[in-house]
Design a protein with these regions (language model features):
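Short, Lys/Arg-rich, polar N-terminal cytosolic tail immediately upstream
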Residues: 1-5
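Soluble catalytic domains of membrane acyltransferases
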Residues: 7, 11-15, 28-180
């Protein structure tokens, strides 16, 4: 399946608008383990992996990482919904079908990386409830190892609060080298 990685001006404007809303309403507090990574990652495709605690995670983490142009993997059932699916498709996303052995997500992810984009993957494959992480699916490690990409771990801590209350904390760790 051929995939168009070049977004039009309307889509880019929408992504910037969403980023502005996220920073205005949710006010994520981002902490880098190594501040120098902010510059060294620019223009370099990597695989960002993050825990998944809420439906907002994809939008919030993508907004925080927008300068690194991440494509996020999205469960196909969400991608296909009429309301949220349209929103998800406008943002940089690639559908993953958990119900079949479909590997289109991998081919599309390879294409995104080849075109200079990073990947944002929630390796749990779903939202973890009760503060306990789910077992990881192998996709993030597979893509990183096969393409020789660094893995950048991210921890999303706390609950989302709109406007008031404690800010969502996003911790971005040091790169993990991958080899195949």
């Amino acid at each position: 399946m051929e995939y168009n990685y070049h977004k039009n001006a309307g889509q880019l404007a929408f992504i910037k608008f969403v980023k502005g809303l996220v920073h205005l309403l949710i006010r994520p507090k981002v902490e880098w383990k190594d501040e120098s990574l902010k510059k060294s990652l620019k223009g370099k495709p990597v695989v960002f992996v993050c825990n998944h605690t809420h439906h907002f995670d994809g939008v919030v983490i993508s907004s925080v990482l927008s300068r690194y142009k991440p494509y996020m993997l999205v469960k196909k059932s969400w991608y296909d919904k009429s309301g949220t699916g349209s929103f998800i498709r406008i943002c940089r996303s690639i559908p993953v079908d958990f119900d079949t052995m479909d590997t289109n997500w991998y081919a599309q992810s390879e294409g995104a990386v080849k075109n200079g984009y990073s990947m944002l993957i929630f390796p749990e494959g779903g939202i973890a409830r009760e503060g306990k992480m789910l077992p990881f699916k192998p996709g993030a490690a597979l893509l990183a190892a096969k393409k020789g990409l660094d893995i950048i771990p991210i921890a999303s801590l706390g609950e989302y609060k709109i406007l008031f209350g404690k800010r969502q904390k996003i911790l971005i760790g040091n790169p993990i080298k991958s080899e195949c």
